[in-house]
């Protein structure tokens, strides 16, 4: 995914405000052997790019002054109540160095899972992304979670997923976290309990 930016020579609160008023967003690219570089981007193009999932979890081709660098989106700051991107950070990546990135999960075959189709349950997404470690060339845009065989009451764990080649999940202490489950809707559980209580009542003499 290509991102076009321009070198920025001035900094400070006043300069950033003037930049935003002209339809630009200040930013920075850092990391690697090169020095951090101040940049500016077209605000509207950046705003639309931020709505794309791939912009957050892909290696970007960041073009600055005609030169292209591989980079990751690392952070962005939004205005508290206006639809305005205040600042954006990119990190350079090297083809030979592993990176840590959060990758979104795509849940597949939810409607056809036995626990949903036959058991009338709901699929619960316990996590929606996973932090992974891999080389830039191995970074997936997303990881598939196939829940098509899940039964009512079943939980899918990390060990049940088929990870792309070269990708390792960073679990931060929990070696096999839960990813998804299928359970009955809360209302259905309450109705079933009430029905059981009513059936067990003995009419007064």
Curated annotation (Swiss-Prot):
InterPro entries: Rbsml_bL25/Gln-tRNA_synth_N, Ribosomal_bL25/Gln-tRNA_synth, Ribosomal_bL25_b-dom, Ribosomal_bL25_C, Ribosomal_bL25_long, Ribosomal_bL25_short, Ribosomal_L25_dom, Ribosomal_uL5_bac-type. The keyword Ribosomal protein applies. The lineage of its organism: Bacteria, Pseudomonadati, Pseudomonadota, Betaproteobacteria, Burkholderiales. Residues 185-205 are annotated as: Disordered. Part of the 50S ribosomal subunit; part of the 5S rRNA/L5/L18/L25 subcomplex. Contacts the 5S rRNA. Binds to the 5S rRNA independently of L5 and L18. Residues 186-205 have a biased composition (Low complexity). Pfam families: Ribosomal_L25p, Ribosomal_TL5_C. Signal peptide: none annotated. This is Large ribosomal subunit protein bL25. One of its GO terms (molecular function) is structural constituent of ribosome. Keywords: Ribonucleoprotein, Ribosomal protein, RNA-binding, rRNA-binding. GO terms for cellular component: cytosolic large ribosomal subunit. This is one of the proteins that binds to the 5S RNA in the ribosome where it forms part of the central protuberance. Belongs to the bacterial ribosomal protein bL25 family. CTC subfamily. GO terms for biological process: translation. Transmembrane segments: none annotated. PANTHER family: RIBOSOMAL PROTEIN L25/GLN-TRNA SYNTHETASE, ANTI-CODON-BINDING DOMAIN-CONTAINING PROTEIN (PTHR33284), RIBOSOMAL PROTEIN L25_GLN-TRNA SYNTHETASE, ANTI-CODON-BINDING DOMAIN-CONTAINING PROTEIN (PTHR33284:SF1).
């Amino acid at each position: 995914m290509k991102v076009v930016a321009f070198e920025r020579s001035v900094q400070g609160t006043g300069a950033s405000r003037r930049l935003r008023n002209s339809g630009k967003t200040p930013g920075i690219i850092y990391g690697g052997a090169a020095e951090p570089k101040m940049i500016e981007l077209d605000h509207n193009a950046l705003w639309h790019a931020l709505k794309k999932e791939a912009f957050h979890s892909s290696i970007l081709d960041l073009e600055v002054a005609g030169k292209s660098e591989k980079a990751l989106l690392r952070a962005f700051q939004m205005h508290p109540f206006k639809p305005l991107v205040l600042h954006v950070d990119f990190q350079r990546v090297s083809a030979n160095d592993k990176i840590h990135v959060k990758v979104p999960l795509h849940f597949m075959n939810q409607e056809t899972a036995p626990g949903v189709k036959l058991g009338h349950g709901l699929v619960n997404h316990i996590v929606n992304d996973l932090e992974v470690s891999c080389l830039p060339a191995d970074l997936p845009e997303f990881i598939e979670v196939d829940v098509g065989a899940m039964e009512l009451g079943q939980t899918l764990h990390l060990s049940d997923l088929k990870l792309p080649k070269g990708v390792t999940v960073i679990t931060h202490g929990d070696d096999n976290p839960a990813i998804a489950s299928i359970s009955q809707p809360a209302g259905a559980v309450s109705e079933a309990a009430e029905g059981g209580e009513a059936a067990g009542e003995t009419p007064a003499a």
